[in-house]
Amino acid sequence: MKQLLDFLPLIIFFTVYKLVDIYTATGALIAATAVQIAILYFVYKKVEKMHLVTFAMVTVFGTLTLAFHDDAFIKWKVTIIYSLFAIALAVSQIMNKSIIKAMLGKELKADDNIWARVTWYWALFFIGCGVLNVYVAFSLPLETWVNFKVFGLTALTLLNTVISVFYIYKHAQPEQDDTAN
């Protein structure tokens, strides 16, 4: 259910965009993200920082989009969120406190240099996606950007996740058997 909740605002944004327009879709995105946060809080009694940052950015840039009737704001939101993620990953790695290791290190055992590579890889991935978003958002038609945002970036993220998991598994330390004498 949690994975569905992660995609709920995106699905609603896309559907409303296709049925109405970018401005109504932006309002729906703000509302859907607020509902997502509320459900996460009431069901799981916890809301991750990533969701809160995303909600804040959606609210700020969505409101600017609606107030100025200018879709450039909602287009920039994607790049800014990805930039913040890249910065957070880079800073965490520089401080030797990899966010990715903190999230996955209990389930997957790997050397710190593997976690560092994966962390830098994701930081570069987010920078690349942010740059690509700017290109698509401001060089191609709105319809293309919406499709890219919903399907392209989602597919790229899933592909990147698969690549990362395979890389970590390839270099993972074998589980130690606690029952061995």
Curated annotation (Swiss-Prot):
Primary location: membrane
Domain of life: Bacteria
Entries under Pfam families matching the protein: IspA
InterPro entries reported for this sequence: YciB (IPR006008)
One GO term describing the cellular component: plasma membrane
Topology versus the membrane: Multi-pass membrane protein
Keyword Methyltransferase: no
Signal peptide start and end residues: none
Record key words, sorted: Cell inner membrane, Cell membrane, Membrane, Transmembrane, Transmembrane helix
Membrane spanning residue stretches: 22-42, 50-70, 72-92, 118-138, 148-168
Subcellular location field: Cell inner membrane
The UniProt record lists the keyword Membrane: yes
Family, similarity comment: Belongs to the YciB family.
Role noted for this protein: Plays a role in cell envelope biogenesis, maintenance of cell envelope integrity and membrane homeostasis.
Descriptive protein name: Inner membrane-spanning protein YciB
